[in-house]
Swiss-Prot record:
Cofactor(s) this protein requires: Mg(2+)
InterPro entries: DHP_synth-like (IPR045031), DHP_synth_dom (IPR006390), Dihydropteroate_synth-like_sf (IPR011005), Pterin-binding_dom (IPR000489)
GO molecular function: dihydropteroate synthase activity; metal ion binding
Residues holding (7,8-dihydropterin-6-yl)methyl diphosphate: 66, 99, 119, 190, 227, 262-264
Quaternary structure annotation from Swiss-Prot or TrEMBL: Homodimer.
Listed name of the protein: Dihydropteroate synthase
Organism field: Neisseria meningitidis serogroup A / serotype 4A (strain DSM 15465 / Z2491)
Protein's pathway: Cofactor biosynthesis; tetrahydrofolate biosynthesis; 7,8-dihydrofolate from 2-amino-4-hydroxy-6-hydroxymethyl-7,8-dihydropteridine diphosphate and 4-aminobenzoate: step 1/2
Domain of life: Bacteria
Effect of residue 147 to R: In strain: 1014
Consequence recorded when altering residue 198 to P: In strain: 418
Result of altering residue 241 to E: In strain: 418
Pfam family, one: Pterin_bind
Length: 283
């Protein structure tokens, strides 16, 4: 596997121990927090600061909801949502990730400075995205697998071999990045839980994360926090109340080799990981 350091802009993030990526949603239609942080920048910044105090290693800031059935958001609207928050946190001296699939938004953020990671649910397939990132010397990249688009991805997703198909797609996208001149240590991969997958597909992927990591050869970033699979597993219909199940799923991912977990409930996840380590469980 590619080494235990993720080159992410201004930072070399050690992956010898699992890292926590804290979520800052700036979307008014977020299922997980009801758009609580989309009303004004100060509310969002206070939330981001709290996540860091609770143990987040990375802040992941996004302005487009990619939940199942979500409507398309123009790059202009997305940028209007994230610009002021990105401009502020870029000066905090912590790793900052931008969750976007739009080249225009990536370009504006990178020109702003202080953005260390592009976290892309579309794996740099938007026109010009791959070329833009290839021109950056150090920006970290997370490539995610998604079958379909957010609007339709949960309408009857099908696979012959979900682990193999996800692995082959991600491996191919990473290879295209390498061919474009992107250094392998800049790349992490996300299998895309709940992005064009049924509950059984998600369970199968979780159980086979070691094989997925071995097949692709890259560190895995896992995002299952408050998602529909947690609701289906626990019976909890309120996304905001899925924290306990989300922590359990994050631990399951780490136990199977995940290097970064993207979460809403940072303190609970950080405490759980600390307890595991103190109890001698190999993370």
């Amino acid at each position: 596997m590619v080494g235990c350091v993720w080159q992410a802009g201004r930072f070399e993030i050690g992956l010898d121990k699992p890292k926590i990526m804290g979520i800052v949603n700036l979307t008014p239609d977020s299922l997980s927090d009801g758009g609580a942080y989309s009303q004004n920048a100060q509310t969002a910044l206070a939330h981001a600061e709290r996540l860091l105090k609770e143990g987040a290693d990375i802040l992941d800031i996004g302005g487009e909801s990619t939940r199942p059935g979500a409507d398309y958001v123009s790059p202009e609207e997305e940028w209007a949502r994230v610009e002021s928050v990105l401009a502020e946190v870029a000066g905090w001296g912590v790793p900052v990730s931008l969750d976007t699939r739009h080249t225009v938004v990536m370009e504006k953020a990178l020109a702003l400075g202080g953005i260390d990671i592009i976290n892309d649910v579309a794996a740099l397939t938007d026109e010009g995205a791959l070329e833009l990132l290839a021109c950056q010397a150090d920006t970290g990249i997370c490539l995610m697998h998604m079958q379909g688009l957010p609007k339709n991805m949960q309408i009857n997703p099908k696979y012959q071999d979900v682990v193999g198909e996800v692995a082959r797609y991600l491996k191919a996208r990473a290879a295209e990045c390498i061919a474009a001149g992107i250094a392998p240590q800049r790349i992490t991969l996300d299998p895309g839980f709940c992005f064009g997958k049924t509950l059984q597909h998600n369970i199968t992927l979780m159980r086979h994360l070691p094989e997925l990591m071995a097949e692709t050869g890259y560190p895995l970033l896992i995002g299952v926090s408050r998602k529909s699979m947690i609701g289906e597993l626990t019976g909890e219909t309120d996304a905001a109340a899925r924290g306990h199940g989300s922590v359990a799923a994050a631990l399951a991912a780490v136990a199977r080799g995940a290097k970064i977990v993207r979460v809403h409930d940072v303190k609970a996840t950080a405490d759980a990981l600390k307890a595991w380590e103190a109890l001698g469980i190999n993370l």
